Amino acid sequence: MPSQLAAMRRKKKSAKRVDQEGLQDLLNSMPTMASSSSTMRHSFPPSPKERPTALGDRLQTALVLGVFCLLAVVVGIFLFYGVTPTEPVCRSDVCLSYSKLLREMLNVSVKPCDDFYSYVCSKWDARHSYSFKEGVYLRFIQRVSERNRRTAVPVQGQSASQKAAKFYQSCSATYTQGGDSELDAVKQLLLRVGVLWPRLSNDSNVLRICFAMSAMLDWAPVILFSVHRPAVPMTVSPSVFFREVLDRRKAMLGGGGSDYRTYFGHMFRVFGQPEGPRDDVLAYGELIAMESHLVPALERAYAVIEGDFVENATLDDVIQLAGNTIPKSAWEAQFRENFDAVVYNGTASQRVTVDNVRFFVTFFDLMHALGESHMAYYLGWTTVQGLSLLTKPEVIRYYYPSHGEAARDHVLLCVGLTHHYTGLTFYASYIRDEVTPEVIDDVALLVRNVHASFRKGYAASPVWKGFVDRSTQPPAANASSSPSGPPLSFVHDSREDALNELFEHYPDMNSTVLGNIEGAVAARRATTRDTRTARFIWNGTVRFHYFVAKAATAVSQRFELMPVALEPLFYSPDAPPAVKYGALGADIADAIAGLVFDDLREADNSTRTAVESQPLCLLHASVAGTRSAVPPPGWPHMTRLQLAERAMSLDAAFRAFLDVTNGGHQTRLDRHHPLSGKMMLFVFWCMVQCGASDGKHRCNDPLRLIRYFGEAFQCEVGTAMATVRDCV
């Protein structure tokens, strides 16, 4: 009801909302002209010789005028908000669910033209500590994990999906049924990999800890040295779990740090040496002093997201990046000791990819500055934190602030581990049941329409046409194993026969999670095929699509949707078009725009300079905005290219919506009649950004470049959301 509320405020008075049914009830309750005259005759019967009195004339005239005025007001309301009797209201179960979502989301006390993000998202932000996309992911994970928890699994002869289910069950059981045997298994593992925490010892070996953890578990708390399968370069990268370590530490240090001190004490009692105090055991204050040097530098380096990597590096290159802190002989010894003949081909031929070079360099610079024993102590401390979550309930709960958060976050931990070690098998049964042929056809149509919108919108542009054509061309016949074609290859890949063949080397899973992890890692290295699945969470953000590396024969990259993109809160085949194109359609458009701009960034300097020097609205509107009376919100939080990419994707999604709805006409949602189809698309497009760290800028900034938004919500010149420059 944004425009209606804005109109009411401009008139400085309130008015009741009158829908079609309410209007009919009101008209039925009013006396008609015939009934009025009849009533008047019965109440005041005139003499046969008398004419109607002047008062009667005036009453009849007033009544007629009143009815006409009421009708005029109603017609005005319908015309003003675009509500016509020919636009029906959708009251299906799906529509009612989206209507309920809007009631929970929209803050009608905020004018859309003042701050659209706050209008759509402020209620969400006030009620949730996570983003809307994370909310969709949590709903998806809840359904998938519950399905796997209830799956009956035989002891032997397990299918691929049953192996994934048993793996998940063995992990989640540690929080509900774990005991001393699980704790003892973790302690034994710590000794095997050389973790001496809580001792500070010169016998510690940083490379041994890193390589042994990576080789046994393909997991590490800070930095991971990973070899997934034979003849594949080692990948060195920051650990995904390290983000969790940083966030949990920050939370526990809040309010004076007593929670962190208490947690340290708990871990010391559980994992400390039984013989009593020793000189080489650090106190809590010494840990804090050490972390004051380590954590800020590692956290800054961890924040580097992209563009900082080295491929096909030799061992000598890696040693040089590490500042020659550790001699080459030690590196070679750890390669030989931890990676067997299936993987290890000798250091002369070993190739390494270093993701996030800054983090790698920072890690070894800190080790050089503080000493190997201190870095090994910190590695041990973070390792204990991670592995303690696979022990028993009372130890696991130490890590979390409440029982409720422990129950929820431990599920997410186990989901992440199962995803990492079993890939698509964890989601396969859910996909086979939920992703019906109707869904596949509908999503394929959605993709085709958005592709067509890009080509149609930029076909006449000599600058953009080539980039758009390459990014929207149909895939080659061998580009995907999926008969539906990208971006739904996960549907084909989740077939049980395909998964059973892919995971044939995986052993039957049992109730011991650490044993299952080691078995999965060994099996992964025994196959030449990649059993991994793209991560749902990347750099702390839930993603609904990912990009597939460009093949040698491919003209450009392609993208794939992830199963979470079809979660009902985000997508339904029965949803109104504005919901489809505002949510999933816009995400597809984001992916295509990402391909376009990645292609632009990879172009040669002359091409890139030629494009950026053109008087293109999408590239220069942000600059123009700084000269306007109302500068773009968040300027310069989004670079010119980022803003142009975001605006291009919104433009394509919106034009696709107009094409399939004959200009934006669609059924209304119950109790949200004033929201036209165009309005609704912008609402759901912005809703996906609710709660994100940069959500306000990703929502508000591009809208000011799209005249359709200002027209839909009638944003007047001078309002914050008025169109700065028309780019469509």
Question: What kind of feature is each model-predicted range?
Answer:
Residues 105-126, 250-268, 650:
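Hydrophobic/aromatic-rich, well-ordered segments within soluble, folded domains that form packed cores
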Residues 1-43:
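Intrinsically disordered, low-complexity cytosolic terminal tails
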Residues 89-96, 112-114, 120-122, 170-172, ...:
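Sequence contexts marking disulfide-bonded cysteines in secreted/extracellular proteins
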Residues 38-71:
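Helix-loop boundary elements of multi-pass alpha-helical membrane proteins
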Residues 287, 293, 320-321, 325, ...:
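Intrinsically disordered, low-complexity linker/terminal regions across diverse proteins
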Residues 60-143:
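Signal-peptide-cleavage-adjacent N-terminal segments of secreted and extracellular proteins
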Residues 141-463, 485-487, 491-494, 498-509:
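Noncatalytic, helix-rich "gating/capping" subdomain that lines the substrate-entry/channel surface
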Residues 110-113, 219, 373, 545-547, ...:
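Short, well-ordered loop/turn elements at secondary-structure boundaries
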